[in-house]
UniProtKB/Swiss-Prot annotation:
It catalyses: fluoride(in) = fluoride(out). The lineage of its organism: Bacteria, Bacillati, Bacillota, Bacilli, Bacillales. The keyword Translocase does not apply. Fluoride-specific ion channel. Important for reducing fluoride concentration in the cell, thus reducing its toxicity. The keyword Electron transport does not apply. Keywords: Cell membrane, Ion channel, Ion transport, Membrane, Metal-binding, Sodium, Transmembrane, Transmembrane helix, Transport. The chain crosses the membrane at residues 3-23, 32-52, 59-79, 90-110. Pfam families: CRCB (PF02537). PANTHER family: FLUORIDE EXPORT PROTEIN 1-RELATED. One of its GO terms (biological process) is cellular detoxification of fluoride. This is Fluoride-specific ion channel FluC 2. It comes from Listeria innocua serovar 6a (strain ATCC BAA-680 / CLIP 11262).
Amino acid sequence: MYFLYVGIFGALGGMCRYAMNLWLGGGDFPSATLAVNLIGCFLLAFIMPFLAEKSRISLVLLNGIGTGFIGAFTTFSAFSVDTIELLQQGEVVLAISYILVSLIGGLVMVKFGRRFSNKLLRRGAHHVD
């Protein structure tokens, strides 16, 4: 059952990533890849703890969302290829900027996602009292 959910959600995540590429793609900077990776960092850090704590969603469905959808939506391989292509084009400053924004931005988005999730979880705990 895990494979089915991961596969279904993976297909949806891949389609969403493709749509983002159509929307933001083109140009000299890989903005679509950067966007999906930053959004994915936030979503994984926000949605997974929140759903695990506050919903009655099964572990199978949670794995489908996390591993399937978010895993297929984000892309480390495209990030790596984009970086190499920037370097091969002589865009060293742009490549280094892309690496730094991806890494630091991803960590910041995880921090924001966890904070937001924790804030909502605490707020929900106060309303139950």
